[in-house]
Swiss-Prot record:
Start and end residues of each stretch annotated as Disordered: 1-26
UniProt name for this protein: Protein GrpE
GO cellular component: cytoplasm
Protein role: Participates actively in the response to hyperosmotic and heat shock by preventing the aggregation of stress-denatured proteins, in association with DnaK and GrpE. It is the nucleotide exchange factor for DnaK and may function as a thermosensor. Unfolded proteins bind initially to DnaJ; upon interaction with the DnaJ-bound protein, DnaK hydrolyzes its bound ATP, resulting in the formation of a stable complex. GrpE releases ADP from DnaK; ATP binding to DnaK triggers the release of the substrate protein, thus completing the reaction cycle.
Chief localization: cytoplasm
Species this chain originates from: Chlorobaculum parvum (strain DSM 263 / NCIMB 8327)
PANTHER family: GRPE PROTEIN (PTHR21237), GRPE PROTEIN HOMOLOG, MITOCHONDRIAL (PTHR21237:SF23)
Listed GO biological process terms: protein folding
Length: 193
């Protein structure tokens, strides 16, 4: 071999070694900068903080949704109660009229054979109507003989009544009603002076 040929072969071998070293990194340990333990702990802490932040956000959103759901349920229940109150308030004059009708039927008419079924029918309608309202939670406010309570009674006038305490209800002009714990209509009453 000539020197020239020998030199070319050495250059080729050198090139091959260089290329192999560049391509075959697996044969050598690659120098990656080693992360310090404090860097890893800081990264873990940052990720834990982010996870906790996301958990808190999820919990907050869940609580907001639950509050929203409860609020809508309360609003629906209140709306139903208001609707029932308004309906009952509108029906009370009918009950008053049936009561007045029964109070003003003359005794002779009540005893007449021809009128007795009519009178009994009107009384039955009044009782059934009153029972229906009671089944919905409507109750009459007791008034006669009670001391005036402005939460339930409305005094329309005062009269002198011997041997009666002042502010005692002596006559009921219009019956009052409650629905549950709410007054639908105050009892209109006459009280003693």
């Amino acid at each position: 071999m000539t020197k020239k040929h020998h030199k070319e072969q050495e250059e080729i071998q050198e090139t091959i070694k260089t290329e192999a070293a560049e391509e075959n990194v697996g044969d050598e340990t690659v120098a990656i900068p080693a992360a310090t333990e404090s860097d890893i702990e800081a990264e873990i802490a940052a990720r834990d903080a982010e996870i906790q932040k996301l958990r808190d956000e999820v919990m907050r959103r869940a609580a907001e949704f639950e509050n929203f759901r409860k609020q809508k349920e309360r609003e629906a229940a209140q709306s139903g109660k208001r609707m029932l109150e308004n309906t009952v308030r509108d029906l009370l004059p009918l009950l008053d009229d049936l009561k007045r009708l029964m109070e003003h039927i003359p005794a002779e008419l009540q005893e007449m054979a021809e009128a007795k079924p009519f009178v009994e029918g009107v009384e039955l309608i009044r009782k059934n109507f009153k029972s229906l309202l009671e089944s919905k939670g409507v109750k009459e406010i007791e008034a006669l003989g009670k001391v005036l309570d402005v939460n339930f009674h409305e005094a329309i006038t005062q009269i002198d009544v011997p041997d009666t305490e002042p502010d005692t209800i002596v006559q009921e002009y219009q019956t009052g009603y409650t629905l549950g714990d709410r007054v639908i209509r105050h009892a209109k009453v006459i009280v003693a002076k």
